[in-house]
Amino acid sequence: MYSIVAEESGLLPRERLLQKGAEVLSDQELLAIVLRTGTKSESVLSMANRILKGMTSLADLSRLSLNELQEIPGIGRVKSIELKAMVELAKRIEKAELARSEQIMSSQQVARRMMLDIGDKPQEHLVAIYLDTQNRIIQQKTVFIGGVRRSIAEPREILYYACHLMATSLIVVHNHPSGEAYPSRNDIDFTQKIKRSCDDLGICLLDHLIVGKSTYYSFREEREDFEL
């Protein structure tokens, strides 16, 4: 159950924000500001409290579709659109912050970026991140989107762009639509295949990451010396 922190009595959320800053407000108060109004029978703070109590974490709010938002009592079409826009804006701010650091320093850094990009996609997406000698991103490219006939990309598709971009290294990332990030036998076989192909061309495969909505698996972190 989501934990609610009660607001300070005597001050409305907007007044608290003006006097003390947004960072001191509870999630309930911030949500109440976004919702703006309640209903005839329920205050906006009470509505925000009820919505949050129905969630296991604040992240659940970002996963609700427009239709699911509208099914929440008191949340009509306009409020659901405003909430969806707020969530999308928050995602884009997070992505912009991550993008400021052009140099890739860790698998976790890439995983955070890619969980936002493809972690909740209903189809499998395979993304290649091409890097220069300083591990700076040259280009991030979606190489493959899963379909009925195929569920994984071929190394040649990934390495074609690596050669074209003159990348010295790359990171391969794909999502599991199930949300689970543990590798399947096919994932392991594919990683072996792409690693051999990279070695043949003198390109370093820095990692293969599998991401879900809120978790990831790194072949480099989980397998000693990246030996598969």
From Swiss-Prot:
SUPFAM superfamilies: JAB1/MPN domain, RuvA domain 2-like. GO terms for biological process: proteolysis. Belongs to the UPF0758 family. Zn(2+) binds at H174, H176, D187. PROSITE patterns: MPN, UPF0758. It holds the Pfam family UPF0758_N. It comes from the Bacteria. GO terms for molecular function: metal ion binding; metallopeptidase activity. This is UPF0758 protein str1465. PANTHER family: DNA REPAIR PROTEIN RADC (PTHR30471), UPF0758 PROTEIN YEES-RELATED (PTHR30471:SF3). Keywords: Hydrolase, Metal-binding, Metalloprotease, Protease, Zinc. Residues 103-225 form the MPN domain. It comes from Streptococcus thermophilus (strain CNRZ 1066). A motif (JAMM motif) lies at residues 174-187. InterPro entries: MPN, RadC_JAB, RuvA_2-like, UPF0758, UPF0758_CS, UPF0758_N.
